[in-house]
């Protein structure tokens, strides 16, 4: 408040004496206006009057800065009171010869609060948990006309007079999903309408509420229980019943390795999918973590993943290619903790290696030796296989099945001479008549007299050679007629001979029966006698 200008001590003394020892006269002092409401720091004009009709001492007593503006005769003065900072009661006084008197005017100062502040809201508020709102108000007058209102948007939550300095108003409200994103604020109302002024409002800075729901159930984590070194696996983490689901943060990690999931959101659920790669440095048991953070809460699921190294078993042949009759050692070796089996080997105690010995035969050419290894990892059986093929070198072969020794074909017919030589490596085959004329093996030819004859088939390879004679017979049309005639004659003669035999047999039977009848020998019914 600005200091007032120096005032003479005499008026104050006169006022005091007039108040203590009022005179017997009827002179009165009045003031206008008797009541004033004005903004803080404002000015007001006050008129002091007296009814004394004689020269008198007229003035105003106030701590406020004052300025005499107008003298209306000896019994009325107008003063300007300025920089009114608080409620005040200036007093007009007059000292008439027949007595002293005083009159007061009541100055009421109004001003809106200097601070209206809503306490900050929690960054996140769980749905279902009550929220406490607190508003502080500093300053503001007149307090009898000052109200504090707490609001959610435009909805009033509480209305209360401002009491105390600073005034504080609190309320507790339940929190629901629908309140997510709602603005909360505090407002003051200085209602001076009854005094002919208006309603003055001050509003705090708003705070937006963020609500959330994170279920008590941990997220579901799906991943391989075991994972082989230098391979990839897929991890999926999911959870239902979240709100707002788009604000959920998902963290996936394998040991110290942070994963980068692709997150798919539903209405109130999410699914996070990530690929995980492991190396030899990760071998052993690792913790796979899925953590979901929403608001101020989190849920976490832990699961162990066993990282293992299990190379395929090694199948070892003494030599992958041997000659017929050579002894070959077949070995199978695997991880020290694995158990191996090798096809063709008699049952042996389980272990990481096995072997057997064989003598190579042509039938072993192209034979596959398969080794199966089994390793138990975290209760799961892991299987690996490896196969090696044996090549056996053996000499050429020509046999009756694949290279018949005799062919008989009609002249002018279409025929395909077939002669297959076997061996490893596959032998070269040539069939020649008289050392020069080749037999077109595997080709369709028209049979002529030139094709007839004996051919020497020779199969040759790095493992040796073998020969075989084959004969081609060509039947001309005249030979076909002779053969048909001979066959027909044989059929006719056979038929005639059979008829003669049957006729003689029946004749002998009748002759025998006649002789028996002449001797009186009874004949047994339904029994034929054996002919002599």
UniProtKB/Swiss-Prot annotation:
Membrane topology listed for this record: Single-pass type I membrane protein
Domain spans labelled Ig-like C2-type: 41-103, 128-193, 230-297, 325-378, 412-464
GO MF annotation list: integrin binding
Disulfide bonds: 48-92, 52-96, 135-186, 237-290, 332-371, 403-419, 419-457, 431-457
Residues found modified as Phosphothreonine: 521, 530
Major site of localization recorded for this protein: membrane
Post-translational modification: Monoubiquitinated, which is promoted by MARCH9 and leads to endocytosis.
Protein's UniProt keywords contain Ubl conjugation: yes
All ranges on the Extracellular side of the membrane: 28-480
GO terms (BP aspect): cell adhesion; cell adhesion mediated by integrin; cellular response to amyloid-beta; cellular response to glucose stimulus; cellular response to leukemia inhibitory factor; establishment of endothelial barrier; leukocyte cell-cell adhesion; membrane to membrane docking
GO CC aspect terms: external side of plasma membrane; extracellular exosome; immunological synapse; membrane raft; plasma membrane
Record bears the keyword Signal: yes
Sugar attachment sites: 202, 267, 385, 406
Pfam families: ICAM1_3_5_D2, ICAM_N, Ig_2
Record function comment: ICAM proteins are ligands for the leukocyte adhesion protein LFA-1 (integrin alpha-L/beta-2). During leukocyte trans-endothelial migration, ICAM1 engagement promotes the assembly of endothelial apical cups through ARHGEF26/SGEF and RHOG activation.
Quaternary context: Homodimer. Interacts with MUC1 and promotes cell aggregation in epithelial cells. Interacts with ARHGEF26/SGEF. Interacts (on T cell side) with CD81, CD247 and CD9 at immunological synapses between antigen-presenting cells and T cells.
Protein name, as recorded: Intercellular adhesion molecule 1
Organism: Gorilla gorilla gorilla (Western lowland gorilla)
Encoding gene, per UniProt annotation: ICAM1
